[in-house]
Amino acid sequence: MEPGQPREPQEPREPGPGAETAAAPVWEEAKIFYDNLAPKKKPKSPKPQNAVTIAVSSRALFRMDEEQQIYTEQGVEEYVRYQLEHENEPFSPGPAFPFVKALEAVNRRLRELYPDSEDVFDIVLMTNNHAQVGVRLINSINHYDLFIERFCMTGGNSPICYLKAYHTNLYLSADAEKVREAIDEGIAAATIFSPSRDVVVSQSQLRVAFDGDAVLFSDESERIVKAHGLDRFFEHEKAHENKPLAQGPLKGFLEALGRLQKKFYSKGLRLECPIRTYLVTARSAASSGARALKTLRSWGLETDEALFLAGAPKGPLLEKIRPHIFFDDQMFHVAGAQEMGTVAAHVPYGVAQTPRRTAPAKQAPSAQ
């Protein structure tokens, strides 16, 4: 062809063999890349009456020790000012944080199996914080990618009166007095404590451990021990082995967990269920264990594991279980669990509690 002479038009070539096959992975990779860039759609909040509602205070969900000190020593105005100045700094995770993350992991599994079901966990932030502090709380929740859409910020007033309106199945707080108020209102509640050291817990299975007497069951048997001693207690339990114990404050929460477990069982996933429950009791198996198990059976409930310690410390066993939370009515069991790295929660119910004074000692208010 001479220089400057126009080229003759050429017909398009047919793609060679294997060209489509070679291009397919490229397009698949590009699709995955752009899908990941798209904002992920958040799940829809369930109706409160259909969900298992867990209400947590801000000091249970996040560590707010420094802020609480400012509130106590310098007052509410300085506290709010400090929160506003630091509202873009997320709080550190608090003792209830791993528990909440585990609840959300269960929700993801439930939504995979039952996309339209509202029978899931619904987490509510229940706090007496001022609404101005809400921005920092929201920023912290978004920072950790938590799905908490329901807030109740009462501006210094007790939030306990709102718990029933939110259909609360369990209330966790760092404020012991508010927990006692909730228990008195018939709501399952516990004061949550940070462990003395951090322990890695399961990211895929929610593990919840319960004491028996005065937690799942009433304090009937503990009253016998306190009044008449262990020998009389063993006689009493043997004589009443086939009489179910009355329910304790957290029976309803175990029932709610069992309801969600059955949704996995019905899909043939009993062994792969992302919820596992434990009964961890100081009872002896041979002398007083049968009544505890028969009581659960009479309620149509069960725990995945039942551990009878016959008075031995609970901390070492809990260290092996690594639950996200352990509920007990006696503070020395709570302290023993803390020492072994377990997040423990005190249920202030029953005869084991320190008698209240008629004129309680004045406590500094807390910013929950």
Curated annotation (Swiss-Prot):
* Gene Ontology biological process terms from the UniProt entry: adenosine metabolic process; allantoin metabolic process; AMP catabolic process; dAMP catabolic process; dGMP catabolic process; IMP catabolic process; nucleoside metabolic process
Q: Which InterPro entries match?
A: 5-nucleotidase (IPR010394)
| One GO CC term on file | cytosol
Region (Disordered) spans which residues?
A: 1-22
Which GO molecular function terms does the record list?
5'-deoxynucleotidase activity; 5'-nucleotidase activity; IMP 5'-nucleotidase activity; magnesium ion binding; nucleotide binding
Q: In which compartments does the protein localize?
A: Cytoplasm
State the needed cofactors, names only: Mg(2+)
Q: Which domain of life is it from?
A: Eukaryota
Q: What does this protein do?
A: Catalyzes the hydrolysis of ribonucleotide and deoxyribonucleotide monophosphates, releasing inorganic phosphate and the corresponding nucleoside. AMP is the major substrate but can also hydrolyze dCMP and IMP.
Name under which the protein is recorded: Cytosolic 5'-nucleotidase 1A
What organism is the protein native to?
Answer: Homo sapiens
| Upper lineage | Eukaryota, Metazoa, Chordata, Craniata, Vertebrata
Question: What gene is this protein translated from?
Answer: NT5C1A
